Amino acid sequence: VLLTFPFTRLSYWVKNYTKGFQLLFKATPKLPDLLNMVNIQDATDPMNVKLGNSSLKNEMSYDVNLLFSSMNIARQRSQSLRLGYTYRANALAMGYSYDAHTGVRKYRADNVNGNWNASASYSFEQPLDKMKRLSFGTWTRVEYVNSVDLIGNSEGSDYQASRSSVQTTLLDETLKLDYKVGSSSTMGVKISAAWRNVDGKAMDFDHINAVDFNYGATVSFNLPWHIQVGTDLTMYSRRGYEGSSMNTDDLLWNARLSYTMLKGKLTWMLDGFDILGNLNNITRMVNAQGRTETFVNALPRYAILHVAYHFNMKPKKH
């Protein structure tokens, strides 16, 4: 049975919503796959045997977020602080065991407990000069994740999945500086870094202490004849991973050319992504269990043409 749980929000604002806080609570249920609850053994593939588990329970995810925000309209200054906590009860996981003598793998769905994460983030943005052309922004986030899952076991012929507990500490920081030239042109620079520390209790767990960082610049300006040009150049780098394929440097260049006609109603836009062709179509990342996952993107470099038409429809007067 799947019950519906309400979404709760408590808010308090002062001075025309320029200062205040919000408390958000959400409970999200998740049903297990009914096929996994059928207590039978599926040996259609004799080397990969699926076992049923009639005692599976519903997964419940509880999210609590507290948000403080403040805005000074005259100085165009804004700042916010967010605190978050998530707990997953009876999380659904797929475990397996491997018999080294026969080569048979047995797997089934189970419930695990102990998955939770806590986070805090702070953002701040404000102009630095009286003309409000030069603005500074920063965003900071720290997060701790306790991930519990099931991993394979190669001892014996019976199903014996093992519990895997992995702790991850994340620290992100982003700094940006933007400058307005006139009323329609802007330029800016940005630098961002994310430190990741992953540790597990298993004897064969490979500790991870790595940094992902990027830095670059953006420019957008208007040309005569209703032409607009925008471009950004960013270097994406990763350091500290054990595998050399994870420690990479990728220079990404994107650009957009747009043309407006019919008094601003019709806009043609041509976007170019990864113009230099430096991105690899294979992406590697580390998940919450400290394992490397590989994804393949078939179209890393492309150009696309957009057409947008803007119109207003006024209701008829009766």
Predicted regions mapped to residue ranges:
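Exposed, low-structure sequence patches enriched in small/polar residues
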Residues: 1-318
